[in-house]
Curated annotation (Swiss-Prot):
Top-level taxonomy: Bacteria, Pseudomonadati, Pseudomonadota, Betaproteobacteria, Burkholderiales
Function: Catalyzes the oxidation of 5,10-methylenetetrahydrofolate to 5,10-methenyltetrahydrofolate and then the hydrolysis of 5,10-methenyltetrahydrofolate to 10-formyltetrahydrofolate.
Family: Belongs to the tetrahydrofolate dehydrogenase/cyclohydrolase family.
Catalytic activity from the UniProt record: (6R)-5,10-methylene-5,6,7,8-tetrahydrofolate + NADP(+) = (6R)-5,10-methenyltetrahydrofolate + NADPH; (6R)-5,10-methenyltetrahydrofolate + H2O = (6R)-10-formyltetrahydrofolate + H(+)
Binding site for NADP(+): G165, R166, S167, S190
GO MF annotation: an example: methenyltetrahydrofolate cyclohydrolase activity
GO (cellular component) term, any one: cytosol
Record's keyword terms, sorted: Amino-acid biosynthesis, Histidine biosynthesis, Hydrolase, Methionine biosynthesis, Multifunctional enzyme, NADP, One-carbon metabolism, Oxidoreductase, Purine biosynthesis
Superkingdom, natural source: Bacteria
Protein name according to UniProt: Bifunctional protein FolD
One Pfam family here: THF_DHG_CYH_C
Biological process per Gene Ontology, one example term: methionine biosynthetic process
Signal sequence coordinates: none
Length: 285
């Protein structure tokens, strides 16, 4: 049995077309959705991510603003800029590209963003509200994974789900969203004693640790859904995920590729969060 491929590019295209329609409707009413992206320092990977986010905005009728600063920018100056953007009615989403230089406290920076403009869903107000199932914004990567389950009719209620990884950006919110959807959730991580014992019982496995081949074919229950959030490089320098794709695809029922799986969905859900913010602002105007 070869797994069915969950194509993130195709689903992204559909969702971005819907976002573009919503953006056009808002713009016609004088409320063009706006996203501000802040980049501090010259991290090549961050520059690529920011470029992709800005392009996605431009391609879908959003207003976008990119602030690029040298790595020497002071924390106080960054916080002052965020305060300006919080008060700018043209901006509905504020995103600070992580990681930040060592002298800047990323927690303080995230908490400085107004919760109603926190389109990454990292602010403590949104992270806390995720516990009750009522956040203003859901973090983009796990939100995109949930859309993948929905698009393919993958049943979550009563399913055994294993999330490998416990980051605030993916692992923890992913577990909360799966729990909210009625799954029985286990969170595994680097200190888990016998990872395979957990994954072999799972109907759904989400791998999000940033470590190649953390999940191999012998660790997967036949017919399981495997979502690969990892972004790594193989020995030849090619992009790969956390999952041994060649092996696991022969056992799983559904699998996401890397690239072309979860990656495109992350930026798509950023657009969806920004449009929702703009719609709320327009309704309150």
């Amino acid at each position: 049995m070869t797994a069915l491929l969950i194509d993130g590019n195709a689903l992204s295209k559909t969702l971005r077309a819907q976002a573009a329609e919503r953006a056009a409707a808002l713009t016609a009413r004088g409320h063009q959705p706006g996203l501000a992206v802040i980049l501090v320092g010259a991290n090549p990977a961050s520059e690529v991510y920011v470029r992709n986010k800005i392009k996605a905005c431009e391609d879908n009728g959003f207003f976008s603003l990119k602030d690029a600063y040298p790595a020497t920018l002071s924390e106080a100056d960054l916080l002052a800029r965020i305060d300006e953007l919080n008060r700018d009615p043209k901006i509905h989403g504020i995103l600070v590209q992580l990681p930040l230089p060592a002298h800047i406290d990323s927690h303080k920076v995230i908490e400085a963003i107004a919760p109603e403009k926190d389109v990454d869903g990292f602010h403590v107000a949104n992270a806390g509200a995720l516990m009750t199932g009522k956040p203003l914004f859901r973090p983009c990567t796990p939100y995109g994974v949930m859309k993948m389950f929905e698009a393919h009719g993958i049943a979550l209620q009563g399913a055994n789900a294993v999330v490998i990884g416990r980051s605030n950006i993916v692992g923890k919110p992913m577990a909360m969203m799966l729990l909210d959807a009625g799954a029985t959730v286990t969170i595994c991580h680097s200190k888990t004693r016998d990872l395979a014992a957990h994954t072999r019982e799972a109907d759904i496995v989400v791998a999000a640790v940033g470590k190649r081949n953390i999940l191999t074919a012998d660790m997967v229950k036949p017919g399981a859904t495997v979502i690969d959030v990892g972004m790594n490089r193989d020995d030849a320098g090619k992009l790969c995920g956390d999952v041994d794709f060649a092996g696991v695809k022969e056992v799983a029922g559904y699998i996401t590729p890397v690239p072309g799986g979860v990656g495109p969905m992350t930026i798509t859900m950023l657009l969806i969060n920004t449009i929702e913010s703009a719609e709320r602002a327009a309704a309150a105007a």
